[in-house]
A protein has these predicted regions:
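Glycine-rich phosphate-binding loop and adjacent beta-alpha segment
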Residues: 34, 42, 90-161, 195
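NAD(P)H cofactor-binding loop motif with strongest signal on the N-terminal glycine-rich segment
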Residues: 18-19, 87
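Adenosine-nucleotide cofactor-binding segment
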Residues: 32-91, 142-144
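Short conserved AdoMet
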Residues: 76, 100, 186-187
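C-terminal hydrophobic helical "lid"/dimerization subdomain
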Residues: 143-195
Length: 195
């Protein structure tokens, strides 16, 4: 999760793609609570404002800004020690360009499609990078680990450090509409279907 990968980059900058989405807005809050400066990618000025309200330190609007160039500017040329990429195919190469030497790319989703045909040699060319593809099952692999994670999450919510905002609700009969809006990046925060 955010806390385990960010623990040794306390008060440093991380990059998080899709910072105004459900997972991204939660990551903005969590990073801020940990004292980590989250740089979030977004697709509009409205989403940039939303991500900042959720705790993002800075945002990059990829619809008209060069993400890798802005990361260099925001980090004073150092890049980010950790990049979180839940988008996948569309952001893979940009993510690699934003990771600091010997840094970590956390590839946890594939909203734009799966990353395929990875040439491992690119990791050395970009600065001896590390890549991980975590799953919840890999971290919550025992009842004890699951309980620790739940305690941390609900503890943060109880302390008011995290809040879960349901930004859009759709009846189950409109699932196709909700999916289209999510795929077209027309939503912010979390979207739920109501039976």
């Amino acid at each position: 999760g955010v806390s385990s990968a960010a623990s040794d980059v306390y008060k440093r900058q991380i990059l998080f793609h899709a910072a105004a989405g459900g997972v991204g807005s939660f990551a903005c809050q969590w990073a801020k609570a940990l004292g980590v400066k989250l740089i979030g990618t977004v697709s509009s000025a409205k989403k940039a404002e939303y991500a900042k309200q959720q705790g993002a330190w800075a945002t990059i609007d990829y619809s008209h800004e060069n993400v890798a160039q802005r990361v260099l500017e925001l980090t004073e040329g150092k890049k980010c020690p950790v990049v979180y990429d839940g988008v996948g195919k569309d952001t893979w190469e940009t993510s690699l360009d934003c990771v600091a030497p010997r840094g970590l790319l956390v590839s946890f989703g594939n909203a734009s499609g799966a990353v395929t045909g990875v040439n491992l040699g690119i990791l050395s060319q970009k600065g001896s990078l590390y890549v991980t593809r975590p799953t919840l099952a890999g971290y919550a692999n025992t009842a004890d680990n699951l309980q620790k994670m739940a305690d941390e999450l609900f503890g943060m919510i109880a302390k008011g450090k995290l809040s879960v905002e349901i930004a859009q609700r759709y009846p189950l009969s409109e699932a196709a509409t909700a999916q289209t809006l999510l795929s077209d990046r027309k939503t912010t925060g979390s979207t739920i279907l109501v039976p």
